[in-house]
From Swiss-Prot:
PROSITE patterns on file: ACYLPHOSPHATASE_1, ACYLPHOSPHATASE_2, ACYLPHOSPHATASE_3
Disulfide feature: none
PANTHER family, A to Z: ACYLPHOSPHATASE
Domain Acylphosphatase-like: 4-90
Xref: InterPro entries: Acylphosphatase, Acylphosphatase-like_dom, Acylphosphatase-like_dom_sf, Acylphosphatase_CS
Descriptive protein name: Acylphosphatase
GO molecular function, one term: acylphosphatase activity
Alphabetic keyword roster: Hydrolase
Domain of life where this protein originates: Archaea
Keyword Hydrolase applies: yes
Catalytic residues (UniProt): R19, N37
Enzyme Commission identifier(s): 3.6.1.7
Length: 90
């Protein structure tokens, strides 16, 4: 089933390749959406795709790239909206 997932990631997640890491894994999983740095030092991720793929992406997000340190994750699933054509970073 298609779903939308909102994720906010805290820790050492800016300046360490975190958004690009998420973008690469999202593309491999057929997920569309974006990853964006926020002023508070966290990263916001909005992703749409099949629920199973979103769960896999969430596992990658929890691990993060080698230089990152994920300290806390908040996430929720929502109804699919289909508003993205690819996965972007901001």
């Amino acid at each position: 089933m298609l779903k939308r997932m909102y994720v906010k990631v805290y820790g050492i997640v800016q300046g360490v390749g975190f958004r690009r890491y998420v973008q690469i894994h999202a593309a491999r999983l057929g997920i569309k959406g974006y990853a964006k740095n926020l002023p508070d030092g966290s990263v916001e991720i909005v992703a749409e795709g099949y629920e199973e793929a979103l769960q896999k992406l969430l596992e990658y997000i929890k691990r993060g790239p080698p230089l990152s340190r994920v300290e806390k994750i908040e996430y929720r699933f929502y109804e699919y909206k289909g508003e993205f054509n690819n996965f972007d970073t901001y």
